[in-house]
């Protein structure tokens, strides 16, 4: 199976399956001399880790990362990157493959089962194999390294909508994001979602979500025209995440409903004595114009579909083409967008770090 590598200069290759012995990634292109240990990566994996509450899958994975290569202790006793490929690995410890006996014989509508069979003629049905969101743990690990390459950039993801119930922007509180299991900046919405997601879980169903991600501290100039646009790469990165069906940069589709003057981001001269660049009065563009960052926050919204693996019976066909029904047992997220939030952050970090290195290679700064 090909197409397991992401990035141009900073290249991440992930490997492994949901119910295999381990998952891992190789991150190539990381500059040398960056202090890096497992403790720099683990907190981000802990944020994504399954089984922490009833609103996510009950699969219990400690997700303890090991750095296998690409680092060495310097003379100061600090472990640093060497510039060679960084290999990361996480062991799988809580697989229950017997839960997927029905999936071996029938396709889950909305899942990758049929598409994988149609393309390859063979698939690992245990937990979805390579198509499982288990793979995204390695994106989060690689994203943690990418953040160290761009230390002046702050990346924040949060859930803005679950099952059609959106946050109230007037109640936005960034401090609330880490205080509830939904990455929600609106405490009232988080309370409502407790009931909403729990009801879906008990009914054997699932819900979709919208995740927003904001990167602050991105300087003007990252990105490139035409075929290496920053927003183009962001869109592709987010669409590569399991269950993602839509991405908006800045105002996205709302921009199509505005007039030219409404959609403009008016510019004002920089404050006297400042070298911070012009001041913008709005950010409809999401911090990117012409495929290149403007110095404003880079923003995107990511739409996650409802989890396809549900206990509710759904009409389908078996591998012989006969009509049947399927109920997916196993352990699955009632709303995959919740744990998708750290993954969105990680992909933002990987894209931005890659473009920083591209910019430095071409422009020398």
Curated annotation (Swiss-Prot):
EC id: 4.2.3.5
Gene Ontology BP annotations: amino acid biosynthetic process; aromatic amino acid family biosynthetic process; chorismate biosynthetic process
Details of cofactor binding: Reduced FMN (FMNH(2)).
Cross-referenced InterPro entries: Chorismate_synth, Chorismate_synth_AroC_sf, Chorismate_synthase_CS
SUPFAM superfamilies hit by this protein: Chorismate synthase, AroC
Positions with a binding annotation for NADP(+): 48
Family of the protein in this entry: Belongs to the chorismate synthase family.
Subunit structure: Homotetramer.
Function: This reaction introduces a second double bond into the aromatic ring system.
Protein name: Chorismate synthase
Organism of origin: Erythrobacter litoralis (strain HTCC2594)
């Amino acid at each position: 199976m090909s197409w397991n590598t992401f990035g141009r200069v900073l290249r991440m290759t992930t490997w492994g399956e949901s119910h295999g012995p381990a998952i891992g990634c190789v991150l190539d292109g990381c500059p040398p001399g960056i202090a890096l240990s497992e403790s720099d990566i683990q907190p981000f994996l802990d944020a994504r880790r399954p089984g922490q509450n009833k609103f996510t899958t009950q699969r219990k994975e400690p997700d303890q990362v090991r750095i296998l290569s690409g680092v060495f202790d310097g003379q100061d006793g600090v472990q640093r990157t060497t510039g060679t490929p960084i290999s990361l690995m996480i062991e799988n410890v809580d697989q229950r493959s017997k839960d997927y006996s029905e999936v071996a014989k029938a396709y889950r509508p909305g899942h990758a089962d049929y598409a994988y069979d149609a393309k390859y003629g063979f698939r690992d049905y245990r937990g979805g194999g390579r198509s499982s969101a288990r793979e995204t743990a390695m994106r989060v690990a690689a994203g943690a390294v990418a953040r160290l390459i761009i230390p002046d950039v702050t990346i924040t993801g949060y859930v803005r909508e679950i099952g059609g119930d959106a946050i109230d922007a007037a109640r936005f509180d960034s401090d609330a994001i880490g205080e509830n299991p939904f990455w929600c900046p609106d405490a009232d919405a988080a309370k409502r979602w407790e009931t909403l997601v729990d009801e879906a879980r008990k009914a054997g169903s699932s819900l979709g979500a919208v995740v927003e991600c904001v990167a602050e501290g991105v300087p003007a100039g990252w990105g490139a025209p035409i075929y290496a646009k920053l927003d183009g790469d962001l869109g592709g990165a987010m669409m590569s995440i399991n269950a993602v069906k839509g991405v908006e940069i800045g105002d996205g589709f709302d921009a199509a409903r505005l007039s030219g003057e409404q959609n403009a981001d008016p510019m004002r001269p920089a404050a006297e004595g400042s070298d911070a660049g012009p001041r913008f009065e709005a950010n409809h563009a999401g911090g990117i114009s012409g495929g290149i960052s403007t110095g404003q926050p880079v923003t995107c919204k990511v739409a996650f579909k409802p989890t396809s693996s549900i206990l509710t019976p759904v009409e389908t066909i078996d591998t012989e083409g006969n009509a049947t029904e399927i109920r997916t047992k196993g352990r699955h997220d009632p709303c995959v967008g919740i744990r998708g939030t750290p993954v969105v952050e990680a992909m933002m970090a990987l894209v931005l770090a890659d473009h920083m290195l591209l910019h430095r290679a071409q422009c020398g700064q």
